[in-house]
Amino acid sequence: MKFARFEINGWQSYGVVDGDHLRVIQGDIFGTHHFTDARYPISSVKILPPTMPKSFWAVGLNYADHVAHQVENLDAGFVSEAQEFRPWQKGVSCIIGQGETIVLPKESDYVHYEGELVIVIGKPARRVTPEEAPHFIMGYTCANDVSSEGSWHDDPSNWRKKTSDTFGPVGPWIETDLDPQGVEIITRVNGKETDRGSTSGMTFNCYETVSRISEFVTLHPGDLILTGAPGAVEG
């Protein structure tokens, strides 16, 4: 099932994708809700980010092939870091929906993109095991983890590099019936394929990721977790 958040004539709601239409949902998609008879053509609505989360997490260096593409120009410490679980947060204010414009900061020298699978949390999660994690995940969506480089290249924080306004396109919807263990991820720019990989190459899979973050932080319904980019990263 695919859940989409949308807007039409200034009114916002959730709907379930039914062919080329959205069937309107009444209630809380993370709690009690039901499907109504109201339907809108997808082409007639504005698709919004699937959630507006309390937190927007990300896992860095989570694919061996991604690390391999960069390791020639980096020191051995980079490889060591790639073997550790290193989550970080992207600012929720950077989130935009499908088709919205990514604004490039005038101060940046270089901007690049990373197509990633995103975990959507469905229930409050605290200290869950990897085996329990699927019960706390509502589904999955897609995101472009946009990054920029500039005079802040050596700044170890990501606040300028990763969290500028519009640097978090997410969507278009939440897929609830996806097995995350072997998903093919294809990134295209202007129709041209620039990267291809599989979630089977993750160092820390989706269930391990939820478990590890929830050891120290409560995850809430609607929270998003970027799971890393496979393959190379081109500008």
PLM regions and their residue ranges:
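Catalytic-pocket segment enriched in acidic/His residues
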Residues: 46-50, 66, 149-235
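A generic local secondary-structure boundary/capping motif
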Residues: 46-48, 75-77, 102-111, 125-132, ...
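Structural signature of FAD isoalloxazine-binding scaffolds in flavoprotein oxidoreductases
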Residues: 75-97, 113
